[in-house]
């Protein structure tokens, strides 16, 4: 391989830059690991490869969630000692604060890496406000890159949208499924289907809840045929999550129900009772909303929310996300030239 000048370790199909530089998508080059030992070996190899590339590269877009050992962030720490370094953008899901020790260690790593990082591209306006203070880096380096729905037109149009008598929820990270199980216990007359691996082996699943682990296309079908889609998010986090689930639900014209109190990002996409419903995150709040959606008296309002969901979600495309990310990269390049 010739020495690439523009390297992307995030799984993004970024376009060429104004200068004509074509991105080298390195995401597929780094293998996934099946155990912690493999993960450590792969991370060391990845970090070393990134440092070798950094010696001749002009632009690098790094993955903030590159693995438990964070090789991309570690590479930035060592890049401080290069005589000449590339423009670096740190992208993707960023970091949650976590417990006291975890937070202190993560903050130390970020601050050590920060001199090598020109921009942090976060996924919500709320993160953009708190990120700099949270991690001890300059606010001028932080930009919001609002996320996108992920189902393709082919996947969305692969079957008829239906309402088959169940409430759907899915996804793995940052979900409060304990709350959802309690909601199901409070509403025994409603059926719930939850597609996740995080509840595997649980013995306390209510009779009206079906737990499934399904391939991608079956996940889409379950969402397509649900009465509504609930995304119960863990509150108090320092990064946004769940966007794929509730935006994909909106593409199907589903009522998308998400808790918004102490949760970042939700209001970037959803206006409550306009194109979705934002709850306060309490047990009663979720139960009341579910019954409101099912109430025949409210079907005209429900229909309007569904229509607006399908209409407003159109702006949150993958192409828009790539354009925003590219503009962030171009901004840094222009600054470096000046």
Task: State the predicted function of each range.
Residues 270-284, 291-298:
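Conserved acidic donor-binding segment of nucleotide-sugar-dependent glycosyltransferases
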Residues 151-153, 159-207, 211-219:
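Conserved catalytic-core segment of nucleotide-activated headgroup transferases in glycan assembly
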Residues 118-132, 137-155:
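Donor nucleotide-sugar binding/catalytic pocket of nucleotide-sugar-dependent glycosyltransferases
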Residues 48-56, 81-82, 100-120:
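Membrane-proximal helix-turn-helix segments that form the acceptor-binding/catalytic region
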Residues 231-248, 257-268:
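Nucleotide-sugar-dependent
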């Amino acid at each position: 391989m010739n020495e690439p000048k523009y390297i992307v370790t995030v799984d993004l199909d970024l376009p060429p830059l104004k200068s004509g530089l074509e991105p080298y998508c390195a995401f597929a080059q780094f293998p996934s690991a099946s155990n912690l030992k493999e993960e450590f070996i792969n991370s060391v190899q990845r970090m070393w490869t990134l440092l070798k590339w950094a010696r001749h590269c002009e632009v690098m877009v790094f993955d903030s969630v590159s693995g438990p050992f964070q090789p991309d962030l570690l590479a930035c720490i060592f890049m401080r000692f290069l005589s000449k370094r590339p423009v670096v953008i740190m992208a993707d899901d960023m970091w949650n604060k976590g417990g006291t020790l975890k937070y202190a260690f993560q903050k130390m790593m970020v601050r050590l890496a920060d001199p090598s990082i020109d921009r942090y591209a976060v996924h919500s306006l709320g993160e953009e406000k708190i990120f700099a203070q949270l991690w001890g880096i300059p606010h001028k380096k932080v930009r919001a890159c609002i996320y996108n729905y992920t189902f393709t037109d082919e996947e969305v149009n692969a079957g008829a949208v239906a309402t088959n008598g169940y409430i759907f929820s899915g996804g793995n990270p940052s979900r409060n499924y304990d709350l959802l199980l309690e909601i199901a216990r409070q509403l025994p007359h409603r059926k719930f289907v939850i597609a996740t691996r995080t509840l595997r082996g649980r013995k306390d699943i209510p009779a009206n809840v079906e737990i499934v682990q399904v391939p991608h296309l079956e996940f889409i079908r379950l969402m397509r045929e649900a009465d509504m889609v609930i995304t119960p998010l863990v509150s108090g986090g320092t990064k946004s999550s769940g966007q794929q689930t509730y935006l994909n639900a909106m593409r199907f014209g589903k009522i998308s129900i998400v808790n918004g109190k102490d949760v970042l990002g939700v209001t970037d996409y959803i206006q409550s009772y306009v194109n979705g419903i934002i709850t306060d995150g309490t047990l009663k709040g979720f139960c009341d909303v579910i019954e409101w959606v099912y109430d025949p008296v409210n079907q005209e309002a429900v229909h309007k929310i569904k229509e607006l969901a399908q209409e407003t979600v159109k702006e949150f495309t993958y192409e828009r996300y790539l354009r925003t990310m590219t503009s962030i990269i171009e901004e840094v390049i222009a600054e470096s030239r000046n």
